[in-house]
Regions:
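Helix-loop-helix hairpin linking two adjacent transmembrane segments in secondary transporters
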Residues: 143, 152-200
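A late C-terminal transmembrane helix in Major Facilitator Superfamily
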Residues: 336-370, 377
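Cytoplasmic helix-loop-helix junction between adjacent transmembrane helices
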Residues: 123-156
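Helix-to-loop junctions at the C-terminal end of transmembrane segments
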Residues: 78-90, 271-283, 365
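Conserved MFS/SLC helix-loop-helix module at the cytosolic interface between two early adjacent transmembrane helices
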Residues: 77-113
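Extracytoplasmic gate region of multi-pass secondary transporters
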Residues: 47, 222-262
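Intracellular juxtamembrane helix-capping segments at the cytosolic ends
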Residues: 131-144, 323-337
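C-terminal transmembrane helical hairpin of 12-TM major facilitator-type secondary transporters
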Residues: 285-328
């Protein structure tokens, strides 16, 4: 029986199986991308939240770092649990549950000022946000062109976070850190509007037979990529969590720091746009090498005293290259993830890095000296990127595992 290519909303015929087609259209990609930032939003805003809980709630710098760490741990746990359900249950039902829980937990956070209850609530908020994040990553990874889909998602995320960072100094001044949590609650409630058009299930994936008809096993390489994701995100969030404090230690004004972080989100749009436009045109190794060099440059520049212009440049380049690299890293794992479950685990390892990184960074602060954080971030970034380059080299001849891509190629 000849395989049939599905039209939008129809089913694919593969052998004797009928498979519901996944919607790869740009409009659906943008819809998924609009929900994508909600999961890690608090972690991305952590520089402003850290400053807020220190200044408004009286937490120490170490306590603030542990708030970031425990929220990241909630995201990690949610991602690991999501690997068990993401291919089995309705995506729209889980998205509704995640959005409602995230909204309520952020409302509760806005009205707490005791450290231990605050930690517990932020852990739960990390779990609900992590469930949303894992779901959207799975949906984007099911696209025929995952590098491009993740690039689009990063563009949308950059635009949303640019607005959030630009508004954060005003919100902190008028309503303290609680205002930022109210903003996150409102965003979660707003995402419920996406439910009617959000995909209810993912795309079908198939294994390509190797010699003797057996499917090749890429498990070891996938785990290498997952560990590399952990190291890379430890580097990124270990430094990013304290970048606002790094700016203050350099003598920069609060408004200048907030503007720089807002500009960094605009720069992230540029980096994500580059990934979306380039897709796999230049391979995956070259963009990651570019990102590695740029990240190391920023970590060298933002040490000790520096000018506002240097801070604007460094924060912007850091975010642009972070989202560029993230798009290609997820594309690397999606390419060899036959069942589509490891890609969800990737968000867990990213979340683990975003949790462990701030915790390690907190332990490296020495009486207002943040330079050892830069050193840690540089080391983790270098090792993680080299591991990804190894995976890329070993899988350079591997094709897509998506069933619908196989159908198209066979027609």
């Amino acid at each position: 029986m000849r395989d049939r290519i599905p039209a939008r909303g129809q089913a694919a015929i593969i052998g004797n199986r009928t498979i519901k087609a996944f919607d790869h259209t740009l409009s659906t990609t943008f819809l998924i991308s609009a929900v994508y930032p909600l999961g890690p939003a608090a972690l991305i805003l952590m520089p402003m939240l850290v400053g807020g809980v220190i200044d408004d709630l009286g937490f120490s710098e170490q306590q603030a770092g542990y708030v970031a760490a425990v929220e990241g741990m909630g995201l990690v746990l949610a991602s690991w649990v999501a690997a068990l359900w993401v291919r089995k249950v309705s995506w729209t039902s889980m998205l509704a549950l995640g959005c409602i829980a995230t909204a309520l937990l952020n409302l509760l956070s806005a009205n707490l000022d005791e450290y231990v209850p605050f930690l517990v609530v932020r852990f739960l908020a990390g779990f609900s946000g992590g469930s949303i994040f894992a779901l959207t990553v799975a949906a984007l990874g099911d696209n025929r062109h995952p590098d491009r889909a993740f690039g689009v998602a990063q563009v949308v995320q950059g635009a949303m976070m640019f607005v959030a960072f630009a508004a954060a100094p005003y919100i902190l001044a008028q309503w303290t850190v609680g205002g930022l949590y109210y903003m996150l609650a409102a965003a979660a409630a707003l995402m419920l509007l996406a439910l009617p058009l959000f995909p209810s299930h993912g795309a079908q994936r198939i294994a390509v037979g190797g010699a003797g008809g057996d499917a090749p096993d890429y498990t070891a390489l996938i785990w290498t990529g997952l560990i590399a994701s952990f190291l890379f995100f430890s580097s990124i969030f270990g430094f990013w969590t304290y970048i606002e404090r790094v700016g203050q230690a350099a003598g920069l004004a609060t408004d200048s720091i907030g503007l720089a972080l807002g500009i960094s989100q605009f720069a992230a749009i540029v980096g994500a746009g580059a990934a979306a436009i380039a897709s796999n045109r230049y391979g995956r190794a070259a963009p990651l090498i570019l990102a590695l060099g740029g990240q190391l440059l920023v970590l060298w520049l933002l040490v000790g005293r520096f000018t506002p212009a240097t801070f604007y440049f460094g924060a912007g380049l850091f975010q642009a290259l972070f989202v560029l690299a993230n798009s290609y890293q997820l594309g690397v794992i999606s390419k060899i993830d036959v069942k589509g479950n490891f890609l969800v685990l990737a968000t867990g390892f990213q979340g683990l890095g975003s949790a462990v990184g701030p915790g390690i960074a907190a332990s490296l602060i020495d009486h207002g000296d943040y330079s050892r954080i830069n050193q840690m971030a540089a080391l983790f970034c270098l090792v993680g990127m080299l591991m990804f380059l190894f995976v890329i080299h070993r899988t350079r001849h591997v094709g897509s595992p998506l069933a619908e891509n196989r159908v198209s190629a066979a027609d």
